[in-house]
Structure formats: structure tokens, C-alpha cells
């Protein structure tokens, strides 16, 4: 069944809510969980769901994303008609770049027309979750709908800024509304549903919608494309986390809408019973892995104190030499020097924490070198003068920062 489906992964957005982490990369390429990129979760879902024809629509500062796709996801055999292919704006529908999700699909209409697929699965490549798309496609076919969208309970953890869905007891969509600016402050009803950025279209119906559409960015496919056609087309909802197609018991979904959401999603991985279990063996998340030696701890060269880490994730190539790491996520090739202390922080690839430095509640970008004796995360006013500080006090030291 998935062999009859063409998959479009939307990965063109910058994702300004994650600035400054998205100053030099799109949201889909932001590191997550000690070794992954955000897009890996969507692509892993495609892999496990049997989807083998995947187009990744890219645009904003896409080099790092393209490199990651090349290095980590060149796993399909094109001789069998399988592919994961990045598609930057081709300007076939004029001389404009992608104006939004809908415009990105519109500009690649020719790829839909040349495909033999009967369905088009459209996925946002910027959220963290596990999902069996094959079951959604099966439900779509069984219902006879022109479009099926994945929905989740708005009371469930994740995001409060997704469009709201009204559905009847037969899962037929009756309405879609854009979220209000103050939606986070309004407690949702017990049965309130929200979209997830997962849509299965009949290709013929999608092409007819493109024929009728204008030239706007169509920022939300549900509100801008599906809602106007509810009177003439059958749209159904597919409940995420239901018994059908369940691949994980947690119903976890997070769109990383802000620095605080990103930080909490990462820190949640360190719980004894994490809301998202990266160690689930039957639905592993694939990514590119550099050829680095194992992480290790060694005594400090001067103090002789053993390097230690507690309740933390350490990626390959990381060395703690006489320092202390507590409740942290350290990506590859991180160095924590003699006497340095790192608490409740996320350190990207190649970060070096100098001797005697102390970091607390920080996100340190790739290749930043923290000087000896530096203190970050203890004086909010001082931190705001130098770095980005989130509403909840997470300090982000941007890429390329020099002390």
C-alpha cells in the first residue's frame, strides 16, 4: 500500500521560534537528543511505514540539511524506484521562491503529475514524534475520503498553537479554525482536537485544489486548503495515539515551537521514564553518525579529580577530563575540562568548556569555546546583555560567539 504513495516532507521553514538556533540552519536540521536532527523523526517514520518515495522540500539555509540527507539518508535504491530527494525551489511556476507550505506544493505540481502514486502524504518535517503512516493511509482508503488529516487531543502535551479541528462521531471533519493568539491561556475542552501537520490527499483531488488555488503562501494546509472545501469534499480525521497503528504507548508529539519547548523536550529525555523513549527497539530513529571514538571520562591533568557525569547523555567523541556534568545532553566531540561544572544544559557538537567554568540551564551552539572560569546561567541581567535568554531562563549562546 505505501508503494502507491508519494511523500512530501515540508522542511523549508526557518522556524523563528527557535532563534538563534535557526540563524544558520532550518528548523528541520536543528540538533536534538544528543545525536539526531529534528527531521530524522519524520524520515524514520517514513522508513518504518514502508514509504520509499520521499521528496524533501527545502529552502532556508539548506546546506546543512542537504548534507545531513546525503550522509545519513542515502539508503534507498534508485534502481528500485526508491528515493529520498531534497527539492529546493525550482521556480517552475514563476520566479518566486517558496512562499509557504502550500506554495511549496504548488510549485512542485509537476512532480505530483509525473508520479504514478494515487495518494500524496504531506508531512511537516519539524516535529518530534513516532507514527505509523501506513495505518493512516489504510484508514484514508477505507473511509473513501478525499483527504485525511492526523489529529491529536489538544489537552495532550505538545503545542497549543495548532489549528483546531471539529469532527463528528464518525471522524468526519466539520470545521478547521486557526488558533487564536491567546490560545495557550484558554483551557481546551476535553474533546478538543488539533492538527499535527500530517495530511493524506487523494492525488487527483489535490491537483484539482491546485487548479482552483491562487498564489498565496497558504501557511496552514488545513485552514487554507481543506476548510474551504468541507462542503464539497469528504475530509476525515485520524486519531494519533489510538489503538490502530500505535507504535509507541506515549502519544508523544512536540513541534518545538519555542526555545523553552525545545529545551523541555530535550530535558524530558533524561527522566527515568521519559515521555519519548529513544531506546524503543522496534521503532528506532536513524541518523548520520560520525566516525568518532567512544565517549569517556578521565582525571583532570592538574587536579587529578575524576571526570564524572550523572543522569546525562554523552555522544561519541566526548571527553570529560576532571569536570562534572549533571542532567545534561552532550553531542559529539564535546570537551569538559578540569574543574568545569555543567548543569542542566545542552551542548552541541564540538563545544569546549574551559577549566573551572560553570554553566547552568544553557544551550551552547556548535563549536563554541567557553573560556576558563566563565559563568553562564547565574546572572540573568548579565546573560541578557550577551546572549539570548528565554522567558523561562534558558540561556542560548549562539554559533560563532567569541568571548
Language-model region placement:
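Unchanged
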Residues: 1-270, 384-399
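Left-handed beta-helix
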Residues: 1-8, 204, 211-403
Amino acid at each position: 500500500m505505501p508503494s502507491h504513495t508519494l511523500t512530501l516532507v515540508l522542511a523549508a521553514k526557518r522556524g523563528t521560534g527557535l532563534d538563534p538556533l535557526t540563524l544558520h540552519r532550518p528548523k528541520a536540521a536543528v540538533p536534538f537528543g544528543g545525536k539526531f536532527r529534528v527531521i530524522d523523526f519524520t524520515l524514520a517514520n517514513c522508513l518504518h511505514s514502508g514509504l520509499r518515495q520521499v521528496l524533501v522540500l527545502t529552502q532556508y539555509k539548506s546546506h546543512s540539511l542537504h548534507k545531513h540527507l546525503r550522509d545519513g539518508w542515502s539508503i534507498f535504491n534508485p534502481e528500485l524506484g526508491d528515493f529520498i530527494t531534497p527539492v529546493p525551489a525550482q521556480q517552475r511556476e514563476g520566479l518566486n521562491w517558496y512562499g509557504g507550505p502550500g506554495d511549496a506544493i504548488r510549485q512542485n505540481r509537476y512532480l505530483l503529475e509525473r508520479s504514478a502514486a494515487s495518494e500524496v502524504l504531506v508531512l511537516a518535517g519539524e516535529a518530534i514524534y513516532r507514527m505509523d503512516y501506513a495505518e493512516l493511509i489504510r484508514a484514508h482508503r477505507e473511509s473513501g475520503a478525499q483527504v485525511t488529516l492526523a489529529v491529536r487531543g489538544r489537552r495532550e502535551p505538545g503545542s497549543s498553537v495548532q489549528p483546531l479541528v471539529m469532527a463528528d462521531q464518525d471522524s468526519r471533519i466539520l470545521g478547521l479554525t486557526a488558533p487564536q493568539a491567546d490560545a495557550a491561556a484558554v483551557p481546551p475542552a476535553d474533546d478538543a482536537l488539533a492538527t499535527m501537520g500530517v495530511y493524506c490527499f487523494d492525488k487527483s483531488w489535490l491537483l484539482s485544489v491546485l487548479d482552483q488555488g491562487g498564489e498565496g503562501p497558504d501557511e496552514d494546509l488545513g485552514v487554507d486548503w481543506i476548510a474551504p472545501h468541507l462542503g464539497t469534499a469528504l475530509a476525515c480525521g485520524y486519531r494519533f495515539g489510538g489503538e490502530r497503528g500505535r507504535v509507541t504507548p506515549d502519544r508523544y508529539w512536540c513541534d518545538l515551537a519555542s526555545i523553552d519547548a525545545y529545551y523541555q523536550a530535550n530535558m524530558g529525555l533524561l527522566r527515568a521514564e521519559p515521555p519519548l523513549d529513544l531506546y524503543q527497539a522496534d521503532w528506532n530513529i536513524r541518523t548520520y553518525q560520525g566516525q568518532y571514538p567512544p565517549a569517556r571520562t578521565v582525571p583532570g591533568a592538574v587536579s587529578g579529580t575524576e571526570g564524572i557525569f550523572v543522569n546525562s547523555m554523552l555522544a561519541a567523541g566526548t571527553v570529560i577530563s576532571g569536570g562534572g556534568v549533571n542532567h545534561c545532553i552532550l553531542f559529539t566531540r564535546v570537551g569538559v575540562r578540569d574543574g568545569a561544572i555543567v548543569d542542566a544544559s545542552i551542548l552541541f557538537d564540538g563545544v569546549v568548556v574551559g577549566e573551572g567554568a560553570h554553566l547552568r540551564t544553557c544551550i551552547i551552539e556548535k563549536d563554541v569555546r567557553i573560556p576558563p572560569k566563565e559563568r553562564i546561567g547565574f546572572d540573568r541581567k548579565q546573560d541578557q546583555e550577551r546572549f539570548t535568554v528565554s522567558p523561562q531562563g534558558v540561556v542560548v549562546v549562539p554559533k560563532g560567539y567569541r568571548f
